[in-house]
């Protein structure tokens, strides 16, 4: 019985971490006040790939994260979880955010500023951010 408790607790902790990370992606998608279906698709695909879960499970996490994003008023809450991961993972998150931003073909000042702030909180250099941004732009052409 105790073993089941810890397994359940571990699963809840993992879901909470995922929800915070996904909420950051949603926040990036909403920053231009235009949360599109294309952005949702990118986020959902990311959820499924990173967590190796089904479409239905991804939908559940997406709903939880959307609620979390609506309740929060600062990105620090979302980035504090990502700080615990490797630099490689952090860079991957920035890449995903740029893909979300450029899903509509352009980037505005609010989106660029948000990504700069996220990079600062995650200790990602302007150089690395610029390289990722350029790579994503070239990939989506």
Locate the predicted segments by residue:
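Small-residue-enriched hydrophobic alpha-helices in membranes
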Residues: 1-141
């Amino acid at each position: 019985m105790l073993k089941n408790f810890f397994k359940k607790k571990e699963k809840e902790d993992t879901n909470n971490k995922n929800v915070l990370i996904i909420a950051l992606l949603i926040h990036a998608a909403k920053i231009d006040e235009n949360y599109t279906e294309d952005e949702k698709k990118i986020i959902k695909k990311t959820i499924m790939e990173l967590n190796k879960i089904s479409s239905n499970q991804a939908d559940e996490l997406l709903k939880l994260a959307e609620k979390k994003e609506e309740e929060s008023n600062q990105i620090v809450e979302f980035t504090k979880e990502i700080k615990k991961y490797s630099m490689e993972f952090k860079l991957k998150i920035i890449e995903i955010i740029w893909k979300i931003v450029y899903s509509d073909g352009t980037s505005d000042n609010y989106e660029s500023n948000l990504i700069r702030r996220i990079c600062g909180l995650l200790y990602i250099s302007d150089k690395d951010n610029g390289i990722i941004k350029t790579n994503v732009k070239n990939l989506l052409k």
